[in-house]
């Protein structure tokens, strides 16, 4: 991503999966993940792509059972949302999602609200957003992996944005010291 960004060859959609040392998983620290997020966001905001880019930083998992908010469930038996427990058939049908809340944030010229997004979303929401974005650019497609219940009940993230106002100023992000667990990493800068 960083090399494509610097060389002006960034594709229309990119996924960044960090090395384990920058994942915030133990034994690594939140600072390690914050460093790479800050580096990517700052590099993007200073690049030629800033005026037409949306960066969604989506964690891959939750805080688990510590979350005080119950996850939404589809009605029992909803196709694609319930399955028989593979380890204990006596338990019968069990929900498979959407699961506990997962943190994410969006950085773009169209997201300056500084608020908290409260719609029900899941990892599927990023796919729903990409479908909407693609359709707006004349490239209609639909992910067949999403069932009708998720399409109806999960956010497509469109309300995160105000596309009538584009603020090209570069927000100042907090300083994050370099990840100590990954000091051998050399990334290009703008």
Question: Which residues make up each language-model segment?
Answer:
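Anion-binding catalytic surfaces of enzymes that hydrolyze or transfer phosphate/sulfate esters
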Residues: 1-37, 41
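Loop/turn elements at helix/coil->beta-strand transitions in domains of secreted/extracellular proteins
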Residues: 9-13, 49-55, 101-102
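Beta-strand elements within well-structured catalytic alpha/beta cores of enzymes
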Residues: 12-18, 37, 54-62, 130
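Substrate-binding rim/cap in mid-to-C-terminal beta-strand-loop elements of soluble/periplasmic
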Residues: 16-24, 76-133
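Active-site rim elements
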Residues: 22-31, 41, 89-94, 110-121, ...
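Extracytoplasmic/secreted proteins, especially bacterial periplasmic and envelope-associated proteins
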Residues: 32-39, 43, 61-64, 101, ...
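Metal-dependent active-site segment of extracytoplasmic phospho-/sulfohydrolases and closely related
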Residues: 39-82
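Conserved small/polar residues in nucleotide/adenosyl-binding loops
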Residues: 183-189
């Amino acid at each position: 991503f960083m090399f494509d960004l610097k060389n002006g060859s960034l594709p229309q959609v990119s996924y960044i999966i960090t090395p384990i040392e920058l994942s915030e998983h133990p034994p690594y620290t939140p600072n390690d993940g914050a460093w790479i997020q800050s580096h990517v966001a700052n590099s993007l905001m200073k690049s030629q792509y800033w005026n037409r880019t949306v960066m969604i930083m989506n964690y891959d998992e939750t805080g688990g059972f510590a979350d005080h908010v119950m996850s939404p469930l589809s009605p029992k038996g909803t196709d694609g949302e319930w399955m028989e427990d593979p380890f204990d058939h006596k338990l019968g049908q069990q929900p498979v999602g959407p699961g506990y809340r997962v943190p994410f944030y969006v950085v773009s010229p169209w997201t300056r609200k500084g608020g908290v997004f409260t719609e029900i979303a899941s990892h599927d929401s990023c796919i729903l957003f990409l479908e909407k974005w693609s359709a707006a650019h004349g490239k209609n497609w639909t992910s067949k992996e999403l069932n009708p219940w998720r399409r109806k009940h999960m956010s497509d993230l469109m309300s995160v944005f105000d596309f009538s106002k584009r603020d090209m100023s570069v927000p100042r992000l907090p300083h994050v010291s370099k990840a100590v667990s990954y000091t051998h990493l050399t990334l290009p800068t703008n």
